[in-house]
From Swiss-Prot:
Keyword Transmembrane applies: no
Name by which UniProt lists this protein: Orotate phosphoribosyltransferase
Top-level class of the enzyme under EC nomenclature: transferase
Gene from which the chain derives: pyrE
GO molecular function annotation: magnesium ion binding; orotate phosphoribosyltransferase activity
Amino acid sequence: MKAYQREFIEFALEKQVLKFGEFTLKSGRKSPYFFNAGLFNTGRDLARLGRFYAAALADSGIEFDVLFGPAYKGIPIATTTAVALADHHDIDTPYCFNRKEAKDHGEGGNLVGSALEGRIMLVDDVITAGTAIRESMEIIQANGADLAGVLVAIDRQEKGKGELSAIQEVERDFACAVISIVSLSDLITFLEEKGDAAEHLDAVKAYRAQYGI
């Protein structure tokens, strides 16, 4: 695990974005942890969050031309990631996001920001069912662009309805890399390093044994 990944987990715990306990997911599964990126909700939080997304992008080595943030949660993520790439990596990246409802006056259309062209890096908080990615792919393809990759904050590394995770299904269906700032494996490593989180560690390991990929 890299330093920025460890720092991200500490940041998420500090902001209560990441919690350990018992949580019922939409799927009905009882999860020993929960991640709610909506709690990164101040200017300083967003600035820090962007630096972690930018670090993961730089670490990945994936080449792309435009950052795309799907409405609504992806919008601030794309914005802060673009700022962090400029400020900390000297990379001036165009960014773009979509409107949920197309506008029929002013500049019109359903895209705001840069033109959606070339190789697109989609940024979002998590992938649960892959629905948002599929909707975004329709927009990307309609503009004649290609999906270079997808970056999310956390990869839960758990099966969906079949044997694959939602992320693996996206990788299979769209032939692109899906990367994350951290994964379930990183959370386990973090808990092991802490040494005083045996209760949470056992619960997370048991969950991975049941649902992990």
